[in-house]
A protein has these predicted regions:
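Single conserved hydrophobic/aromatic residue that forms the stacking wall/gate
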Residues: 1-7
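Extended, H/D-rich, highly charged conserved domains that either
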Residues: 12, 18-20, 365-369, 374-453
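Short helix-loop-beta junction
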Residues: 25-42, 104-107, 184-192, 266, ...
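Active-site rim loops that border cofactor/substrate pockets in soluble metabolic enzymes
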Residues: 29-30, 37-69, 435-490
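Glycine-rich, anion-gripping cofactor-binding loops and their flanking helix/strand elements
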Residues: 46-92, 205-234, 249, 477-499
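Peripheral docking tails and interdomain loops at the edges
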Residues: 75, 86-160, 165-169, 261, ...
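Long, well-ordered, tryptophan-enriched scaffold segments
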Residues: 294-348
Length: 549
């Protein structure tokens, strides 16, 4: 019927399933039919064709796969057009809208996106639909098939073994203390990795230029850093690669690499390879291997970062001699880098005790007890000073002691995923056992740190026991909540409260869907369980004013 229908027919993708509700879509489907057009939903045609793969994005959701197939179907029919509905603030659709647009553009089709919110005035929508109809009729009359071959695939430049020798690998900033140490660890393995340390307002503007503005703030920051570095002229585009972590979870972070590849293409650097740093086998990168020695050094770097972070925030808040803590911190950063380069296990172990003992000598003025404020939230925003508007510095200036969670805790949380999958879904017991063993090895690595901190008189927060944290949240939410920071974010808040830190700032990017559930969504329940809890959620985005935060 579609092939024989009149040229005025239009295919309208109904958005997400709930967009079929007239109370939500404000009667847009009725408006379309009133213009003499037919309406089809994406699920009515998605089974007719398959989208060409591999796609630029990670196609991990059934609904998203239907969208891409529906867009492909529309591309095959001259008398069909597509209208995509999405809800205002639906960050997940920042991934789908770009990909659907690319598919349609490859067939010479106009992409129309209509954002749905509580406003029900359809005047502007009527104009957009009429414009779409006029464009379709004009295209049909012209019968111009140039460049409409449906080629929307992306040419992924692979980082080869040969590239390892002379390529510079650019890494975006996330956690300044930890990533400076991880840069050293990567260099010892033969990778010429350069950490992009600085972020400015220009970085944000660059990110906004090349990334869908509905994507989350961290994706805008990291992409902006990379493109800004390439445009600076410091790096040869023919000898440069980029690296980005990829968790494989449901968070948009899994698609950061897709965002980056699109930005590279749009900025004129399509031949720069992007390395996926992951341990779940998402992308094969011949020139980058996570060997056991490299993993061990990376974990040591994270442990050093966690320990130095504790030393810095605790002692800086109370030091008698201003600047003494920072000077000692800088000294130990260099020592830790040297041990990561050339040290052995014995030197690493001894350095843990030496760090704590050295910082123990710093005299503190504890005549006035300062309120402790814990920072939790999305993993980049809580550590990245520019990303959170330097909230730690602000709190210290206001007379608070800042407490930041261990980065290693997040790594252990990620390792629990396969264990949870197996316990709830009976997936793969062997992988679950391997994950448990990995967590046990990390606990062994942290043993000296726990012991050294336990001997200190300065009340440091010890490294977390991930299984204990998991148990603390089971009466609040399911441990099946693994997207983004998942149940671990809730557990971090409870851990702080149980350690006498009831004042908590929960930071997240604007429209971070996981944090709506495991962050903001559990605050009321936590307050009911812990009446002394003082939790304040703060959103960050490229345009948020500091005064609002």
């Amino acid at each position: 019927r579609v092939r024989s229908s009149a040229a005025s027919d239009v295919y309208k993708r109904q958005g997400r399933p709930y967009h079929s509700d007239p109370e939500i879509n404000h009667g847009i489907d009725t408006l379309i039919t009133s213009l003499g057009l037919c309406v089809l939903t994406e699920d009515s045609v998605a089974n007719q064709v398959e989208a060409k793969r591999p796609l630029r994005v990670v196609d991990q959701w059934v609904f998203h796969a239907r969208l891409y197939a529906a867009a492909e179907f529309v591309g095959h029919h001259d008398n069909l057009e597509l209208i995509q509905l999405n809800s205002f603030g639906c960050g997940v659709d920042a991934v789908t809208t770009d990909q659907v647009e690319e598919i349609l553009s490859s067939y010479g089709k106009m992409y129309t996106l209509i954002k749905i919110d509580e406003v029900n005035n359809l005047g502007a929508v009527r104009i957009r639909i009429r414009s779409l109809l006029a464009s379709m009729n004009k295209r049909l009359a012209a019968k111009n098939d140039e460049s409409n071959d449906g080629n929307y695939g992306i040419n992924k430049k692979i980082f080869t073994k040969e590239m390892k020798k002379d390529y510079t690998i650019l890494c975006p900033q996330m956690a300044p203390i930890h990533f400076e140490l991880l840069e050293t660890a990567m260099r010892t393995a033969g990778y010429n990795l350069v950490l992009l340390r600085e972020c400015t307002q220009k970085t944000v503007e660059t990110g906004l230029k090349y990334v869908n503005n509905d994507a989350c703030y961290p994706s805008i920051l990291v992409t902006g850093q990379m493109i800004e570095a390439l445009e600076s002229g410091k790096y040869d585009p023919n000898k440069t690669a980029l690296i980005m972590s990829q968790t494989g979870g449901g968070c948009r972070a899994t698609n950061y690499i897709g965002f980056i590849r699109k930005a590279l293409k749009d900025a004129g650097y399509p031949n720069i390879p992007v390395i996926s740093f992951n341990v779940v086998g998402m992308e094969k990168v011949p020139g980058f291997k996570l060997t056991i020695p490299l993993l061990e050094k990376l974990l040591r770097g994270v442990l050093y970062g966690d320990l130095l972070q504790k030393m810095l925030t605790k002692n800086r808040a109370y030091e008698k001699n201003k600047g003494e803590t920072q000077a000692l911190f800088d000294k130990w950063m260099e020592k830790c880098k040297e041990i990561l380069k050339n040290g052995n296990s014995k030197e690493f172990k001894q350095s843990i005790y030496d760090i704590v003992n050295d910082f123990e000598k710093i005299e503190l003025d504890t005549s006035i007890e300062k309120p402790k404020v814990g920072i939790v939230g999305e993993v980049l925003i809580k550590y990245h000073p520019f990303g959170n508007n330097f909230v730690a510095d602000l709190l210290e200036k206001e007379g608070a002691e800042v407490v930041l969670p261990d980065f290693m805790g997040f790594i252990k949380f990620m390792a629990t995923h396969k264990v949870t999958f197996n316990s709830l879904l009976r997936t793969n017991p062997i992988v679950a056992k391997i994950s448990k063993a990995a967590i046990s090895l990390i606990d062994i690595l942290e043993k000296d740190s726990k012991e050294a901190l336990g001997k200190s008189k300065k009340d440091y927060l010890p490294p977390c026991n991930i299984w204990h944290l998991e148990n603390t949240v089971k009466d609040i939410l399911s441990i099946g909540n693994q997207t983004g920071e998942g149940w671990f974010l809730t557990a971090e808040m409870i851990e702080y409260i149980e350690h006498g830190i009831p004042n908590i700032i929960c930071v997240q990017p604007f429209a971070c869907l996981p944090n709506h559930v495991v962050g903001k969504g559990v605050i009321k329940t936590i307050r009911e369980k812990y009446p002394n809890a003082n939790i304040s959620p703060v959103d960050y985005d490229p345009g948020a004013s500091e005064s609002n935060q």
